[in-house]
């Protein structure tokens, strides 16, 4: 039996970062002034944390290798982007930070679309929902890139959080997982 500690840490990390996305997204919509005032610090800390969680996820051994399959390179990218967000000064426009967020969410959603297609190959019925959530997050990512508003950023963060949360809940299985119908698991 394989030690499940690392996969549990990765799954817990993804669920926690999803909750952070939910809270941050809600605050972007409900209190945009507060979020704009502290956006660089908040973004930097979240990006670095998310990058670390992605790298931990990459090295965990889940049954399907779906939830964390692209996370090593993405994790390093997020950490670097987080450091840049923390180091930039006031000369960097908030619209540029929002555009970077939109690009990041678009990239993550495109990789998740590929995860949905791979899930279909494994016969997981959850692939349809992964695809829908990924397309929704990607759409909001594009809107953030084009419009650069804090409200769209909030919606994009909510969609990203929902997508990540669902993917980790429905694709991250331990290697000693006994196969059950995916429909039974979602009850």
Please describe what each predicted stretch is:
Residues 1-56, 61, 176-187:
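N-terminal topogenic module of multi-pass integral membrane proteins
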Residues 2-5, 52-64, 112-120, 164-171:
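C-terminal ends of transmembrane helices
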Residues 4-17, 62-73, 119-129:
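Short, amphipathic, aromatic/basic-enriched membrane-interface segments that mark the entry/exit
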Residues 45-54, 102-112, 156-167:
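Alpha-helical transmembrane segments and their membrane-interface exit regions
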Residues 80-132:
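Membrane-proximal helix-loop-helix units in multi-pass membrane proteins
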Residues 81-89, 136-150:
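Hydrophobic alpha-helical transmembrane segments in multi-pass integral membrane proteins
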Residues 150-186:
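C-terminal transmembrane-bundle signature of multipass membrane proteins
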């Amino acid at each position: 039996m394989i030690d499940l500690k690392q996969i549990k840490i990765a799954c817990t990390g993804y669920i926690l970062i999803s909750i952070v996305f939910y809270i941050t997204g809600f605050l972007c919509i409900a209190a945009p002034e507060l979020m704009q005032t502290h956006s660089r610090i908040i973004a930097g800390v979240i990006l670095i944390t998310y990058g670390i969680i992605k790298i931990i996820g990459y090295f965990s051994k889940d049954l399907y290798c779906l939830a964390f399959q692209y996370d090593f390179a993405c994790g390093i990218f997020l950490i670097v982007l987080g450091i840049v967000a923390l180091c930039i000064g006031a000369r960097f426009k908030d619209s540029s930070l929002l555009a970077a967020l939109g690009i990041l969410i678009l990239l993550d959603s495109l990789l998740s679309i590929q995860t949905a297609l791979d899930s279909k190959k494994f016969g997981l019925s959850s692939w349809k929902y992964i695809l829908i959530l990924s397309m929704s997050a990607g759409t909001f990512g594009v809107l953030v890139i084009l419009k650069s508003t804090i409200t769209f950023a909030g919606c994009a963060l909510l969609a990203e959080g929902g997508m990540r949360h669902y993917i980790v809940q429905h694709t991250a299985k331990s290697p000693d997982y006994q196969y059950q119908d995916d429909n039974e698991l979602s009850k």
